């Protein structure tokens, strides 16, 4: 679908009403299987989420700057992310790259997800769990977002898949953050470190429950 949207990117901060709209939209998208036209359209686009990983590689040579609490759990994290590929399949709509800059708060439509270059199908938890670290970076506490994931239908329906996906996602961020900076994107690795830290704080809360 092509449409003209008039508005800014949403505000993910705790004082904004935008996160509530986003979670309501995620609930709507994940509440039922993807319609046949969507499934047909994305049939040739395999989910990149199933290939997310990082902890197993970090386990072979733990980085010196890795938090000691995480270093002590590398075996557990590697085992957890190894379960994700077997859980990565599903029949729900998956945006695949959900961040504030891939959304527009249209003055008439409200929050709308845009840039569906990675659209595919998969379990309901992917987009909601991907968004969770972004909300922590925007100022929400890990404890608040952990409760939200415990309660939201997209992630509460299959908590095992949600935790395994978060493990794979945060491992991916930690691994990539330690690669050489690519030319033309000087702030990328610093951003990846921040989102890795946010995601790991959330993952640790889930693992400790």
Stretches with model-predicted labels:
Residues 1-39:
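ATP-binding pocket architecture of kinase catalytic cores
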Residues 19-22, 70, 74, 192:
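Hydrophobic packing residues in well-ordered alpha-helices of helical domains and bundles
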Residues 193-209:
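Regulatory N- and C-terminal appendages and interdomain linkers associated
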Residues 29-37, 84, 139, 177-181:
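A general structural signal marking secondary-structure boundaries and capping sites
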Residues 125-156, 166-183:
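Active-site activation/catalytic loop segments of kinase-like enzymes and analogous catalytic loops
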Residues 79-126:
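Active-site acidic catalytic loop and adjacent metal/ATP-binding pocket
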Residues 34-95:
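An alpha-helical support segment within catalytic cores of ATP-dependent transferases
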Residues 1, 25, 98-100, 105, ...:
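Hydrophobic alpha-helical membrane segments, chiefly transmembrane helices and signal peptide h-regions
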């Amino acid at each position: 679908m092509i449409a003209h949207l008039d508005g800014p990117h949403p505000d993910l901060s705790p004082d904004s009403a935008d996160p509530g709209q986003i979670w309501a939209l995620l609930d709507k998208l994940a509440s039922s299987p993807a319609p046949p036209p969507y499934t047909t359209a994305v049939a040739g686009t395999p989910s990149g989420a199933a290939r997310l990983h990082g902890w197993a590689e970090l386990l072979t040579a733990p980085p010196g700057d890795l938090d000691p609490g995480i270093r002590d759990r590398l075996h557990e994290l590697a085992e957890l992310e190894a379960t994700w590929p077997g859980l990565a399949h599903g029949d729900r709509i998956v945006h695949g790259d959900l961040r504030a800059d891939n959304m527009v708060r249209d003055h008439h439509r409200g929050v709308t997800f845009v840039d569906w270059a990675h659209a595919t199908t998969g379990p309901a938890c992917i987009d909601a769990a991907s968004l969770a670290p972004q909300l922590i970076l925007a100022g929400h506490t890990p404890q608040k977002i952990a409760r939200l994931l415990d309660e939201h239908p997209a992630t509460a329906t299959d908590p095992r898949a949600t935790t395994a996906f978060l493990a794979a996602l945060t491992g991916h961020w930690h691994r990539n953050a330690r690669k050489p900076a690519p030319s033309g994107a000087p702030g990328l690795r610093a951003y990846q470190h921040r989102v890795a830290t946010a995601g790991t704080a959330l993952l640790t809360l889930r693992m400790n429950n």
